[in-house]
């Protein structure tokens, strides 16, 4: 389905002309329509949140698979940098024996996430926090799709000109948030735990090195997306 067909499907005929005008101005079709499908659920999106991508659906799918093989009890999950809430809400819906918390530094993003929580009849606990600053318990699963684009990296204009830079860019060649999370994560993990990251396709080995630096007694797995690009890091803590 191309963008015009997408507009025709989701917009009222009276709004179609204005929608096409915005499309020609370079505004993403998802922001024009105001929602996006993710893992079979519908999420409201606007310029305060990142538009969920297929790769993030893959992150969720792989994480669900690892959780089902790794835990036999009710689990506590934390989503760091939740944005629209798509990861947290999907995990809450798909993993019945779970309690899901989700945080973001952006209050505007949290407003959207809480709306999506209601619309999808999920029970995620959303709270405002700069990484772990307001987190106060331990988790079995910590998942994050943090900002990972380096400031000097070229990206498409439609992304750069519309999506929130706070959700896109990171210092330290895009590695800042991985470093901060991994540096501080130990005190928020239960004895048996999983960390799941979406990453930039050139960052895999560097993030593996960070895992070895901060969490030396864990197993780390680098996985590719459907485009055969390095895209996901999974860390398994067994004790």
Question: How should each PLM-predicted stretch be described?
Answer:
Residues 1-239:
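Auxiliary N-terminal substrate/complex-recognition segments of SAM-dependent methyltransferases
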């Amino acid at each position: 389905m191309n963008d015009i067909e997408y507009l025709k499907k989701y917009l009222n005929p009276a709004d179609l002309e204005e929608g096409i005008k915005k499309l020609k101005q370079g505004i993403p079709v998802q922001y024009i329509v105001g929602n996006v499908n993710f893992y079979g659920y519908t999420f409201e999106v606007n310029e305060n949140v990142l538009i969920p991508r297929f790769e993030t659906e893959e992150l969720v799918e792989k994480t669900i698979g690892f959780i089902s093989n790794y835990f036999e009890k009710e689990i506590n999950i934390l989503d760091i940098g939740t944005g629209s809430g798509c990861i947290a809400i999907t995990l809450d819906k798909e993993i019945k024996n779970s309690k899901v918390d989700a945080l973001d530094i952006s209050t505007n993003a949290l407003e959207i996430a809480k709306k999506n929580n209601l619309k999808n009849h999920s029970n995620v606990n959303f709270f405002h926090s700069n990484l772990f600053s307001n987190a106060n318990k331990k988790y079995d699963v910590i998942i994050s799709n943090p900002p990972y684009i380096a400031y000097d990296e070229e990206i498409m204009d439609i992304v750069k000109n519309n999506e929130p830079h706070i959700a896109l860019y990171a210092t330290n060649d895009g590695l800042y948030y991985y470093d901060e999370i991994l540096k501080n994560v130990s005190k928020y993990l239960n004895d048996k735990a999983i960390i799941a990251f979406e990453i930039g396709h050139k960052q895999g080995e560097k993030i593996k090195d960070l895992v070895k630096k901060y969490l030396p007694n864990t197993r780390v797995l680098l996985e590719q997306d459907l485009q055969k690009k390095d895209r996901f890091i999974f860390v398994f803590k067994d004790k």
